[in-house]
Amino acid sequence: MKALIDAGVVKFGRFVLSSGIESPFYVDLRRALGHPDLVKWVVSGYLSALSRLKFDVLLGVATGGIPYASILGYLLQKPFGYVRAGAKGYGTMQAVEGADVAGLAAVVVDDVLTTGNSLINAIKAVREAGGEVVGALVFLDREQCGSQNVRRETGVEVFSVYKMRELLETLKPYIGEGHYRAAVEYLAKWSC
């Protein structure tokens, strides 16, 4: 697990997230892509979580979910594609690219879940393209109400490989008491 720190996947300090929320930690799973051993570990976690779901197609959420949905689709020999943040304004003007999803059971894959807005938008896009979303899968749920927001807005269950508190416990020996305490206190402020 120290490799997550060494590779810069998990960082501690002051960060502003894409949601505009300030956080004492940042998780950037894209950094794992430069480390094959970490990719193998991350994909193994995703595969374990996916074993609970029956689906036809995997769709990565742009951009963090795309590489992992692609790897998973290849390994499982399932069609895969991705969901853009918005439909492109040219060509076919689609929001869902790659695999055709019409009439298929889809799992939407993302890397990190905070508020759930990216997943909510992706689920809506898949439904608009005729797909049935049977689950959403993230590697890390930051435990900031994202899974509850997704369920409330879409009815879709979010599955995660890790919850942030679990990850913090695992990383505690490598991050120091101050960072650990700041992160735990920060998470305690979130009640869903």
Curated annotation (Swiss-Prot):
Pathway: Pyrimidine metabolism; UMP biosynthesis via de novo pathway; UMP from orotate: step 1/2
Coiled-coil features, chain-numbered ranges: none
Cross-referenced Pfam families: Pribosyltran
Catalytic reaction equation(s): orotidine 5'-phosphate + diphosphate = orotate + 5-phospho-alpha-D-ribose 1-diphosphate
Organism: Pyrobaculum calidifontis (strain DSM 21063 / JCM 11548 / VA1)
Cited InterPro entries: OPRT (IPR023031), Or_phspho_trans_dom (IPR004467), PRibTrfase_dom (IPR000836), PRTase-like (IPR029057)
Alphabetical list of NCBIfam families matching this protein: pyrE (TIGR00336)
Protein name: Orotate phosphoribosyltransferase
